[in-house]
Amino acid sequence: MMSYDAETGIAKVKCQSQSTCGACSARETCGTESLSELNGKRGEHIFTLETITPLRTDQMVEIGLEEKSMLFSALLMYIVQLFTLLVATLLSSYISENELIRAILIFMLTALSFVMVKRYTRKLGQQTEFQSVLLRVLF
């Protein structure tokens, strides 16, 4: 945990995701670890959550998200963009024969879907079922 305000009950928690590459026997021949090393830091995320449990800085805590919200987020991030890409491709073939115009249209519609999903997820983040919760204090 990074910080905790006892008056408001708001805690800032830094999460670090870890790859399982370190325990894999095929690690030497697999390119996944090499690619993840190119990205630099592994996923560090900062979450803000409300809790009535008194906390101290540098405590290790476990947080969680509702499964429904995780599945819905995955749907938004992957399926919506894929569906938009497919629909844009089909639409562009009816609109123009010129491949450059088709490519620009596909790119613009797909980019628009990313923007719309980002705006929508900001609104979803305000709802309680899409906010992380403190499950327990580890130490």
From Swiss-Prot:
<keyword id="KW-1003">Cell membrane</keyword>
<dbReference type="Pfam" id="PF04246">
    <property type="entry name" value="RseC_MucC"/>
</dbReference>
<keyword id="KW-0472">Membrane</keyword>
<comment type="similarity">
    <text>Belongs to the RseC family.</text>
</comment>
<dbReference type="InterPro" id="IPR026268">
    <property type="entry name" value="RseC"/>
</dbReference>
<protein>
    <recommendedName>
        <fullName>Uncharacterized protein HI_0589</fullName>
    </recommendedName>
</protein>
<keyword id="KW-0812">Transmembrane</keyword>
<feature type="transmembrane region" description="Helical">
    <location>
        <begin position="71"/>
        <end position="91"/>
    </location>
</feature>
<keyword id="KW-1133">Transmembrane helix</keyword>
<dbReference type="GO" id="GO:1990204">
    <property type="term" value="C:oxidoreductase complex"/>
</dbReference>
<feature type="transmembrane region" description="Helical">
    <location>
        <begin position="97"/>
        <end position="117"/>
    </location>
</feature>
<dbReference type="GO" id="GO:0005886">
    <property type="term" value="C:plasma membrane"/>
</dbReference>
<keyword id="KW-0997">Cell inner membrane</keyword>
<dbReference type="InterPro" id="IPR007359">
    <property type="entry name" value="SigmaE_reg_RseC_MucC"/>
</dbReference>
